[in-house]
Amino acid sequence: LSSPGVSRVVLPGPQSDLAAIQRLLDRRSSAVLDRDRRSFMSSIARTSPDFVRRQARLFKAMVGVEFDSYRLVVRPDRFGDLARPSDVRRYSGADSVLIPVTEERYRIRGFDTEDAAEDVFYTFVKKEGQWRIAEDADLDDLALFSARHLWDGGRIEAERSDRFLQYKHPCTGPECDAPTDDFLDLAERALDQVNRYWTAPWHQEVIVLVPNGTDELARMLQATIDLDNFVAFAYSTVDVEHDLDYTGHRIILNPNAFESQTTQGVFTILAHELLHIATRDASGPFMPVFVDEGYAEVAAYDGDPSGLSFFNSQVANGDFDKKLPRDFEFTTGSGTEIYESYQEAQSAVEFFVGRWGNERFVDFYRALGRADIAPGTTRYHLDRALRGAIGMGYDDFEKAWASSIENS
């Protein structure tokens, strides 16, 4: 029998084993901060030569990261022991095999005010009384992927400006898809533009990550969708230890798509992603995509009439269904269909800001973002926030927006 709302997690192993695993993780964490290669590598079992090589490369790259803090915390209370019989058989020479969730928590000096928090699925093996880490990819076939960072892909180098830190892999030659030399200057100007829209306080030090290609990008994002239609991403970790807070805000570039952009295109993209970073701490579980993406586009184009040229041509051709885009329409369909959803969202938010003002929109966004996990759908909470801000619900807002398009 079970009661509603009550779940049972089987804790992996005796407390003495969990305590020993945590001590192992503490030593590994200290080795990262102390840049102690010997101590770091001593935490690794020698069962997989590939894993040992990857860990050696990881440590070498992490030396280039200015960590303000770094911790690994075993969390058996999350999902218990995830090791299957097949995982245990894989390490037949071990006395014991455990795969609990491990939280990786860290801060980059000068940029993170809260812990970035991500899950790692280490396989811990016990042999001759000693626990070590044997692998971090044994659960990939279950789509339980360990977090991958830019430094997992090899050595990195840093570039700085007043409010930005950019990490990328060293690369020279014509095959490199690296941002231009004026990239950080453009980022600084884009941030100033964003501040004219998002007037609420936010932490204005931003990290930009530049992977080598879409394969590395997809692994960092744990994405299964086609990334070719996307130039950059605003990425945040979710800290389950502190009420599902968004932390560890980053902008991650798609280098393959980025290289074809004009200077103005780069500026617009940066402003869009920075708006997401600026609003992230005010967002919440009931924020629809059209509100987020629409406001980012409004801030990015900053009143430029060309920003809605595609949408206007669609309307002129009679291709306008008078409906606000739904969340799934921003990630599925053709590139043209996805772009159309962004344009519709931009038009809707532009309508809101034009009629009721930017400050009213900021208040509306913050009110909607404050909605805690509670009964009711996203539509319910959105409807409630709209009524509080402008005196009309979702359906009436949608009709008013559509009418403004038809009568323009």
How should these model regions be labeled?
Residues 5, 9, 109-154:
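Short beta-strand edge/turn micro-motifs at domain boundaries
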Residues 28-40, 356:
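Short helix-adjacent coil turns
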Residues 22-30, 350:
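Amphipathic alpha-helical repeat scaffolds
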Residues 160-288, 305, 317, 378-382:
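Juxtacatalytic substrate-recognition/specificity segment
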Residues 237-248, 264-269, 281-408:
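Acidic/His/Gly-enriched intrinsically disordered linker/tail segments
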